[in-house]
Amino acid sequence: MRLSVRRVLLAAGCALVLVLAVQLGQQVLECRAVLAGLRSPRGAMRPEQEELVMVGTNHVEYRYGKAMPLIFVGGVPRSGTTLMRAMLDAHPEVRCGEETRIIPRVLAMRQAWSKSGREKLRLDEAGVTDEVLDAAMQAFILEVIAKHGEPARVLCNKDPFTLKSSVYLSRLFPNSKFLLMVRDGRASVHSMITRKVTIAGFDLSSYRDCLTKWNKAIEVMYAQCMEVGKEKCLPVYYEQLVLHPRRSLKLILDFLGIAWSDAVLHHEDLIGKPGGVSLSKIERSTDQVIKPVNLEALSKWTGHIPGDVVRDMAQIAPMLAQLGYDPYANPPNYGNPDPFVINNTQRVLKGDYKTPANLKGYFQVNQNSTSSHLGSS
């Protein structure tokens, strides 16, 4: 009996020693970590150097970081940004997804903090320096882009007004590239007015006001694009993308360093399919990009702009001429379409396309009026 008691006491003692040893080991490791942190200079922990790791449905692991070649698609709303991102989304290696809406707002806030001398002083005094803010912006933007859709080898973001911050974004993501969608401002404004696309600061009851605001917005974006440089920012003319999709998309994919895929010419066939094109049920362009690329949206603005605005067009929107559009031509000669596009237009006129099942009930595609409401914008 005594022997049994001794064995029990011995076993208990060994267990106690083992627990104490484990706890001591943990404390040693924690102390080393603390000491290492004290010896490191301030800011040695760099979250912007960390990677996001995601696993796709194909069980492939994707790693995303600040050095990745992100693609940013933007431009004044109603300039073809949705069509462009749908075409890219059709590529098997690319995922753009719907507008996040939040990224341009956060970028605008960041810009406001920088412009306000008093606010910047307060932030600096609190230790919230430009370096801290930039690291936080970098992590936030990457997190939103990466996690608001399925993982892919190449990620892109389409929020139209992000390209007002191209220079800043190119600093946060040094290997990023930008596609600036450019469209005849008269067509963009007619589209936003007739489709009642609310944009902050635009008076949708006035063509003159909207064209003035269009001019200001595209002027800022174009200047940012030029400052970033032609190696990183490519102006993409909506009219040429629609008239000559194969030629335009080859130039775009070459610029982005992405291999060619015929899928980009048939985005409408991949809508709502796994790994294909995901469309928002509430974005204004959704009911248009379900159709193949077609022609009539190019010039359906003709005859709708008030006469006094037409007369003053060169003064109201000087960026038209700078971008290569004739402000006095109504409409300009944008060029001759490829046979492929003519065939697509005939398909649309016949109603030879289907609304994806997941989008039915959220908008109506009136096939009886397609002859006057064609196009993807």
UniProtKB/Swiss-Prot annotation:
Modification after translation: N-glycosylated.
Glycan-linked positions: N343, N368
Catalysed reaction equations from the record: L-tyrosyl-[protein] + 3'-phosphoadenylyl sulfate = O-sulfo-L-tyrosine-[protein] + adenosine 3',5'-bisphosphate + H(+)
Main subcellular localisation: Golgi
Enzyme Commission number(s) of this protein: 2.8.2.20
Disulfide bond positions: C96-C156, C225-C233
Superkingdom of origin organism: Eukaryota
Documented effect of changing E99A: Loss of sulfotransferase activity
SUPFAM superfamilies named among the record's database cross-references: P-loop containing nucleoside triphosphate hydrolases
GO BP terms, alphabetized: 3'-phosphoadenosine 5'-phosphosulfate metabolic process; fusion of sperm to egg plasma membrane involved in single fertilization; peptidyl-tyrosine sulfation; prevention of polyspermy
Side Cytoplasmic, residues: 1-8
Chain segments carrying region Interaction with peptide substrate: 101-105
Lumenal topology ranges: 26-377
Group of enzyme by EC: transferase
TM region(s), chain numbering: 9-25
Entry-linked Pfam families: Sulfotransfer_3
UniProt keywords, alphabetically: Disulfide bond, Glycoprotein, Golgi apparatus, Membrane, Signal-anchor, Transferase, Transmembrane, Transmembrane helix
Tissue: Widely expressed.
Membrane topology reported for the UniProt record: Single-pass type II membrane protein
Site label Transition state stabilizer, positions: K158, S285
GO CC entries: endoplasmic reticulum; Golgi apparatus; Golgi lumen; Golgi membrane; trans-Golgi network
Complex formation: Homodimer. Can also form heterodimers with TPST1.
Protein name in the entry: Protein-tyrosine sulfotransferase 2
Taxonomic source organism: Homo sapiens
